[in-house]
């Protein structure tokens, strides 16, 4: 199953993206989600196939969500994941001596 998908970036939350079928645009996305998502800025279009690898999402889940509900919401990474990637110097900067 091949799908042409448009990916939009949230104006309210860094790292939050919305995947929709290009042919549907944002028509199938619920109003409540759009209110929480903010202004949708088009990032790029992508051809999705089950064989394709995505950087931070499971392609099978994305394709299933697009088929069933018409969109897939990619949430930003958890805050703990950001902290794990900080240099040791920054992690210890405010530690008491």
Swiss-Prot record:
Location of the YcgL domain: 3-87
Gene3D superfamilies, A to Z: YcgL domain
SUPFAM superfamilies for the chain: YcgL-like
Pfam families: YcgL
Name of the protein in question: YcgL domain-containing protein Pfl01_1389
Organism: Pseudomonas fluorescens (strain Pf0-1)
């Amino acid at each position: 199953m091949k799908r042409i998908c448009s990916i939009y970036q949230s104006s309210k939350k860094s790292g939050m993206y919305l995947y929709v079928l290009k042919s549907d645009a944002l028509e199938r996305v619920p109003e409540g989600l759009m209110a929480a998502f903010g202004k949708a800025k088009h990032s790029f279009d992508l051809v999705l196939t089950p064989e394709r690898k995505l950087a931070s999402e499971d392609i099978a889940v994305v394709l299933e969500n697009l088929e069933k509900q018409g969109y897939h919401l990619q949430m930003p990474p958890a805050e703990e994941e950001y902290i794990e990637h900080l240099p040791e110097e920054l992690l210890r900067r405010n530690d008491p001596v």
